[in-house]
């Protein structure tokens, strides 16, 4: 049985990956400072180590103590707007934090890492669907930090033979149907939980930012991928590395685009609630259409999304939000 350190494993995507690791016979050890994660998202039988990504000595100690074989790295700050207002926080937490993690891995002789990257590394795409060799022109600090980490990983691979898989997510959504975990951010910035919180009455209204885009209904189109499908991809990437596979970069998306209006209409149908929607002006830096090509990971690792239909994504998220109107706190 192999031991996997999951940094940020008490967070939204990390907690779902912990579940998938357990299903596949791995032993996850969660390393999280709980600044945005939730201890309640970590199963009782899983070791939760409360620690900071910048503490190289403690990281090395934990890697040695638990005989860590590989790392899956989620720990990061991830609010696009905040990254533009407070870039120092993002370069410190994301770039310097990842450097500290890599140094701890090097010192502890841990040679495999799966990295949580983002479609934000592409910026405004020149064409869709977006492939891994598309231009990398991030338009915000968050995306730039993730791209810098990808470059660091490539350099560590070249210099120290530390193998990696970087996974560029599109829009993660949904919740586990088998465990009581879901999406709980403060502040919340993702469309589907915002919509569902409005349906619950936790929020007064949900806003559409821009209705004059060059799309079928004038609103932005995004590629939504179920968090459980993302979790499966992480385990496939890990198995690829442990089997001696070379370093890789993959997109993770459903390859289907849905507009903001389509998501809102689907949520109204699934919840049976006609909540208030308001129209606002565009936000700067929002591309009209972002849709992934996941052909590369499908061809190389056999990853196929199994539950990333809009109905499945919204239905599983709605079930979790109904049971947790105040998130993990209530």
What are these regions (language model features)?
Residues 39, 170-191, 201-222:
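Short, flexible, glycine-rich and Lys/Arg-enriched loop motifs at helix boundaries
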Residues 194-330:
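C-terminal substrate-binding subdomain of Rossmann-fold SDR/epimerase-dehydratase oxidoreductases
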Residues 51, 63, 90, 183-187, ...:
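Pocket-edge positions in alpha/beta enzyme catalytic cores
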Residues 1-175:
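N-terminal Rossmann-like NAD(P)+-binding domain of SDR-like oxidoreductases, especially those catalyzing
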Residues 127, 138-145, 184-191, 223-227:
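The catalytic Tyr-centered alpha-helix of NAD(P)H-dependent dehydrogenases
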């Amino acid at each position: 049985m192999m031991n996997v350190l999951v940094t940020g494993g008490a967070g939204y995507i990390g907690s779902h990956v912990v579940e998938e690791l357990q299903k596949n016979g791995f032993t996850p050890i969660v390393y999280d400072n709980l600044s945005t994660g939730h201890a309640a998202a970590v199963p009782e039988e899983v070791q939760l180590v409360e620690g900071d990504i910048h503490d190289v000595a403690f990281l090395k100690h934990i890697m040695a103590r638990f005989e860590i074989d590989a790392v899956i790295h989620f720990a990061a700050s991830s609010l696009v707007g905040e990254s533009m207002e407070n870039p120092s926080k993002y370069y410190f937490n994301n770039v310097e934090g990842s450097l500290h993690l890599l140094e701890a891995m090097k010192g502890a002789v841990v040679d495999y890492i799966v990295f949580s990257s983002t479609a934000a590394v592409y910026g405004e795409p020149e064409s869709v669907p977006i492939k891994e060799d598309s231009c990398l022109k991030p338009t915000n600090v968050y995306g730039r930090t993730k791209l810098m980490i990808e470059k660091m990983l490539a350099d560590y691979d070249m210099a120290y033979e530390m193998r990696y898989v970087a996974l560029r997510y599109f829009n993660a959504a949904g919740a586990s149907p088998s465990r009581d975990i879901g999406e709980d951010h403060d502040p919340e910035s993702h469309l589907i939980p915002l919509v569902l919180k409005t349906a619950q009455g936790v929020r007064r209204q949900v806003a559409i930012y821009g209705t004059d885009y060059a799309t079928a209904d004038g609103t932005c189109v995004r590629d939504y991928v179920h968090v459980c499908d993302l979790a499966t991809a992480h385990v496939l990437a890990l198995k690829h590395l442990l089997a001696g596979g070379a370093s890789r970069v993959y997109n993770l998306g459903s390859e289907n685009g849905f507009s903001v209006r389509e998501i809102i209409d689907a949520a109204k149908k699934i919840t049976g609630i006609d909540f208030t929607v308001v129209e606002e002006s565009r936000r700067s830096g929002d591309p009209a259409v972002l849709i992934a090509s996941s052909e590369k990971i499908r061809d190389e690792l056999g990853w196929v999304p199994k539950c990333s239909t809009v109905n499945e994504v919204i239905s599983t998220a709605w079930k979790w939000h109904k049971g947790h109107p105040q998130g993990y706190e209530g």
